[in-house]
From Swiss-Prot:
GO terms for biological process: L-proline biosynthetic process. The gene is proB. CDD domains: AAK_G5K_ProB. This is Glutamate 5-kinase. Keywords: Amino-acid biosynthesis, ATP-binding, Cytoplasm, Kinase, Nucleotide-binding, Proline biosynthesis, Transferase.
Amino acid sequence: MKVIRKLKAKRVVIKVGTSTLVYPDGSINLRAIDQLAFVISAMRHRGREVVLVSSGAIGVGLNYMGLKQRPKAIPEQQAIAAIGQTELISIYKERFAIYEQKIGQLLLTRDIFVYPKSHHNVLNTFEALLKQNVVPIVNENDTVAVDELDHETKFGDNDQLSAIVATNIGADLLIMLSDIDGFYDGNPNADARAQLLGHIEKVDQHTYKLAGGSGSRFGTGGMVTKLKAAERMIDANGQMILANGADPTIIFQILAGEPVGTLFG
């Protein structure tokens, strides 16, 4: 008997990692971006409210500048992010326009959610965009985000950013697309016996012990950051699905309740 998941998905946040948008050799995966635009546009046309949290600014910037490695110096990283974000949003605008879907860009820092006035204003911006049938595309403002002793502006990674956005705007579901099929009970790259876990109701210390590793060469997120995002969603009575973003049309399967990836909550 086929298992069908019960999901609430009126308002959905989709987080796409750099590994989905940029090939391992550093070139831009235009096919994946086009599929993402197609899926999200279809969701909007069917009445769902969708916010896209997109990584990739530095990865796209490296490609644009013909560089193979992320620079180590913060000013150089932030310069690459500024270049890449401009190119990335231009690609998104072009691809979404094919499907007659308008987009709007929001570049955020953590302190926006800390201070009441800016917090209130950014939530109003999200609501206004969604009301006008516009898809907000969100990224951390890497060009200015830094952590200082008395003033934190960085989210740390877009896994955390996506969960913070989702819980603040009252999203039912966070779909996190990455370069892995879901959450395993071991490292599938090192252990052939590792099993994909289809459903995790609660993220606890045992779950964290199963996780490990860091992000890709072009990204920053690892499994631990994804678990923290899932924990945040569960605490807010939401759900999160972690799935492989190699083919973004997997989102259709997720919304149909098919048991792909790992459901948290």
